[in-house]
Curated annotation (Swiss-Prot):
May play a key role in the regulation of the intracellular concentration of adenosylhomocysteine. It catalyses: S-adenosyl-L-homocysteine + H2O = L-homocysteine + adenosine. Substrate binds at T68, D151, E213, K243, D247. This is Adenosylhomocysteinase.
């Protein structure tokens, strides 16, 4: 038995495997799930539409996505459409423990007799625990998983890298400059290779497709595709308009402020704020902070995004130009080493540093931890780091997603858009698998419009309907799609 397995064991009750913080939190979680269902019209509409068809019957979906109340509604939607599901979070801090408990117990179970879905997630996992949970999510009794629903690409990477190393006959040793997380990842694969030399290959051969939620995970998928290492089709959910233009912007506009307020409770008005990156997420960050009266500056590598920022009223600067005067610094790029140790040392005393990109390497936390700076934990996911010269900075969520670590993430309504796309993408790959090659696809425009239409109606909007003559004049169908694929919205 390995070190990890000695400390971490799967619990099982009434035939349901799980590892969560506390099943007694299930009633609280169920109350919040019921409220969330009211705010997630897209998912509820899909339940009604497909209730009698069960299009996901036979699907064994391994899901790696933030285990929140909103995700609970997604999971139970997948189950209502016929799927079997196993779940883990895609972030060590993002799990809402009451939501995880409620999903395990299910709407008709009790903590003593759960009747829900296997979940392996709790808030505040170590890296070792995180990857252990990911393996449990992908490890099914009997037949292996045949679908993956991913956020950030960790589940997909675990399967594909595991299969790749099995084919090579060896798991490579960690390099000195590898991140602490990658070393844990390799160690898990090495331990598993000692006991089962074909585990990941079997899963990779069984999986019919993956649907990916976020920018970072999509990048990984395109890298696998370019290298000829993608053994199944993938749908890029992130670039559906009703995801990227809503979740990424409007969701961030709501949840960034929530995370900063809960983490620090500082007045934002009047503060100098530096936003690194002006993509859809960065736009939401800048808009929310400017709305609070902050003086916002933006960094960008892309002249088009930089011009957008300037036209929106934000100065475009480099990190080096602004880091010494910023009161709050937020990274939102999807890239690495955006804020280095030298940048952190140059920050003002008690300046706040946070990240809202998917991974923790936008801020070089590894270098900060090695620097000799003293860390004092103020409260969960809020740390003060003091340098040798006596000045300090406040780091939120250890450089990971602050909106989920310090708060509860995006609100239900905007996640209904994103998760409706996920459900539709899962149905698409499961029911029409032979129509897809081993490549990365986006959802068809008419499906994007379907998701938007549901939510327009839920907000009380009334769409104008084209006449037949008007539709012919602009060369579209009366029922859509209304825009070409290259339209940017």
């Amino acid at each position: 038995m390995t070190t990890t397995e000695q400390r971490l064991t799967v619990e099982s009750r009434n035939g349901i495997d799980y590892k969560v913080a506390d099943l007694s939190l299930a009633e609280f979680g169920r109350k919040e799930i019921r409220l969330a269902e009211h705010e997630m019209p897209g998912l509820m509409a899909l339940r009604r539409e497909y209730a009698e068809v069960a299009p996901l019957k036979g699907a064994r979906i391994s899901g790696s996505l933030h285990m929140t109340v909103q995700t609970a509604v997604l999971i139970e939607t997948l189950v209502s459409l016929g799927a079997e599901v196993r779940w883990a979070s895609c972030n060590i801090f993002s799990t809402q423990d009451h939501a995880a408990a409620a999903v395990v117990v299910g709407p008709h179970g009790t903590p003593e007799e759960p009747k829900g879905t296997p979940v392996f997630a709790w808030k505040g996992e170590t890296l070792e625990e995180y990857w252990w949970a990911a393996e449990q999510m992908l490890t099914w009794p009997g037949e292996p998983a045949n679908m993956i629903l991913d956020d950030g690409g960790d589940a997909t990477m675990l399967v594909l890298r595991g299969a790749q190393f099995e084919k090579a006959g060896v798991v490579p040793p960690a390099e000195d400059d590898d991140s602490a997380e990658y070393k844990v990842f390799l160690n898990l694969l090495r331990e598993r290779f000692e006991t089962d030399k074909t585990k990941w290959t079997k899963i990779a051969e069984s999986v019919k497709g993956v649907t990916e939620e976020t920018t970072t995970g999509v990048l990984r998928l395109y890298q696998f595709e370019a290298a000829g290492e993608l053994p199944f089709p993938a749908i890029n959910v992130n670039d559906s308009v009703t995801k990227s233009k809503f979740d990424n912007k409007y969701g961030t506009r709501h949840s960034l402020i929530d995370g900063i307020n809960r983490g620090t409770d500082v007045l934002i008005g009047g503060k100098k704020v530096l936003i690194c990156g002006y993509g859809d997420v960065g736009k939401g960050c800048a808009e929310s902070l400017a709305g609070q009266g902050a003086r916002v500056q933006v960094t960008e590598i892309d002249p088009i995004n930089a011009l957008q920022a300037l036209m929106d009223g934000f100065d475009v600067v480099t990190v080096e130009q602004a880091i010494g005067s910023a009161d709050i610094v937020i990274t939102s790029t999807g890239n690495k080493d955006i804020i280095t140790l030298d940048h952190m040392k140059a920050m003002k005393d008690k300046a706040i540093l946070g990240n809202i990109g998917h991974f923790d390497n936008e801020i070089d936390m590894a270098a900060l931890e090695r620097s000799g700076a003293t860390r004092i934990n103020i409260k969960p996911q809020v740390d003060e780091w003091t340098f040798d010269d006596g000045h300090s900075i406040v780091v939120l969520s250890e450089g990971r997603l602050l909106n989920l670590g310090n708060a509860t993430g995006h609100p239900s309504f905007v996640m209904s858009n994103s998760f409706s796309n996920q459900v539709i993408a899962q149905i698409e790959l499961w029911t029409k698998n032979d129509e897809y090659d081993n490549a990365v696809y986006r959802l068809a425009k008419h499906l994007d419009e379907k998701v938007a239409r549901i939510h327009v109606e839920a907000l009380g909007g009334t769409l104008t309907k084209l006449t037949k003559e008007q539709a012919e004049y602009i060369n579209v169908d009366v029922e859509g799609p209304y825009k070409p694929e290259h339209y940017r919205y």
